[in-house]
Amino acid sequence: MSFDAARWNQGKLRVHLIGVAGSGMTPLAEILLDLGHEVTGSDLKPAPARIIQRGVGFSLGQAAGGIGPVDVVVASAAIPDENVEWMEAKKRGLVRLRRAEVLGQLARGKKLLAVLGSHGKTTTATMVAQIFHEAGENPSFYLGGYAPALGASGRWGKGDWLIAEVDESEGAPTQLKPWAALLLNADYEHVDRYANEKAVIAAYQQILGNVAGPVIVVAKEETAAMDAAGSVKQKVTFGWEKSEADYLGSWEGENAEGIRFGVKGKGKDLGTFAVAATGRHNGGNALGGLAMAAELGIAPEKIRQGLQAFRRAERRFEILVSEPALEVVDDYAHHPKEVMATWKAAQARGRERIVAIFQPHRYTRLATFMTAFAEALAKADLVVLLPVYAAGEREMEGFGVAELAAKIGELGGKVEVAGSMPECRTILGKVWQEGDLFLFMGAGDVTQLAKKVARDFGTFRAVRDLVKGEGVVKWYEPMNKHTTIRIGGPAQVWFEPESEEALGRVVRWCGKEGVPLTVVGRGSNLLVRDGGIGGVCVHFGQPGMSKIEAEGGKIRAGAGARLKQIVSVAKANGIMGLEFMEGIPGALGGAMRMNAGAMESWTFEAVESVRVMNREGKVSEVARGDFEVKYRKVPRLVEDIAVGAVLHGKPGKPEEIAEKLKQYSRKRWDSQPAAPSAGCIFKNAEKIPAGRLIEELGLKDTSVGGARISPVHGNFIVNQGGAKAVDVLRLMEKVQARARKDRGIDLEPEVIVVGEDE
């Protein structure tokens, strides 16, 4: 359906953006809002909060019903023709436009300043927009990342200029007619579209052929860019010393505040310019933006003010954390040249080590530049590789992270491979050293990991400072080491207190700061989700919280005391009645919270009193009679923390106790699987034990992924190797659905499920 471009300025339209959270669609949403249009959008990832706050109706996920009563539907080239919403728009006869078409239509009413290049477009376009803003030009801008100093990634201003980065990844946008253009470089990129470097140069030549006014192009150091601009008449060059460019920069240095360089413009000394950016490559970007602004009549002093006001665009060497213990930097680098330039900028920060966390973007790009990526990454002190962000591409055998890791190793680099984001966090927690710089790079969702690591480190550092050596504090401790089923992502902060006083300090801090606090015992009857446990995870593994003493026919024990050890001490002191605990693979604290049982006996039958800490860090001794005790649950101990208890038994001879233990051991080995498990997975139903029900349903030996219902006991799910929490949960759902359908029984989980999904 045809669409008159003038309609964008002739009253409100209802516009739906497919993929609104993308870096090319979010600025378009902001521009359309500025023009007074009603905007809705959908995406498979969350949209920036700022556009939702401005009124964009956002839907997470895409469906035919996701398009309401709208006039226009817009999608980027990344959205395939078979996208369900794109197809629905066609079915309904709605106006359908690609993002580049809309940008071209909007640009007709402005003087378009196009920023071009394989790298550096967002940073440079942001610099130019900032210069024009400070010069009072009230420009419109369209940027590939959020500009903090401008408060948006897209804006429709009242001035004549539209500053836009123009992406060549979709081919030469012939519908654009720039008034002026800035070409930063023309490296071989987007290998899924262009066969070779000549094809890339040809695309830029086509774009530059449509430019009405000056073309600012980087000088000799970028020969491909000069080739692309070879036939341009109004060509103005910029570059560093010895390039003989029209705008000649001289590097003056870099410090914590940014970079400084001097400029001579067409033989005239323009003075020194400073910009809050890192690295010589960003100095080149600033020099190019300066040249464009100067050629379009912006005074040097206004340019200087604009560059001083500039703040890095989102994900362009964005420093998320900077403190002596750790610096975390997030960057969009996804081409070997970008990786190299970003590493050089990181090196200039003067940290102890650089740990590069890299997520390759597209298999085609990795396959084409495998060796170049390895050479750039091997310069880091340590490389952690994430799975390839496919961006819709199919996997290419022989061109994955395993091959990249091997090449880095051949070059002498140290490398670790993470199979997932949670595994990467586990690796980072293991390798972190005081003074490190964590450099996250990639064009995919690695940015979410970078932001999480930056946030989580603050919690880790705060807890470590609170503890003051009275216990163990670890960052990103893998929970599969601490659960009997050997499953679970990392704990954000793992804390083993040595004393009640240290525990109380952390408990009070968590309550004040709103940080989740989870207490885990020996990890039986516990399933930790694959994303791990957020906040602080407390484990009573230190001697100060796991003491066991026998006195007057009773046992006083800390919450961290292993049940097996409690039984051993009881036996040595002639205390009978605790033998059932010997086979429960847990600690006292967890056993009390769950009222764990075995051999027809229950933990709270042996409890005389419990020492508890509330969430304000206050400790009190509570008698057994003051607790409500339920099947597999003691409600008060879900909130309050059991830090110890007094247990009672009856007098018994050691040989009698030993015989009882042998009987229980034989029974347990005959009826329970030896493979890693969380113990009984479901509570018994009112009329039938869960294990027997599962057996009668014919579900023994059923598996999902690496999780399997034990052939020995139907109420045990075992980890047969490499199982994930999601496998166990899906298998549990399968059992519950079958029990409900065939028997009308709702099976309630006995296992406690904690944490967040991957």
Task: Pin down the residues of each PLM region.
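Nucleotide phosphate-binding/pyrophosphate-handling subdomain across enzymes
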Residues: 3-16, 24, 28-31, 35, ...
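Structural signature of FAD isoalloxazine-binding scaffolds in flavoprotein oxidoreductases
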Residues: 488, 495-500, 527-546, 593-623, ...
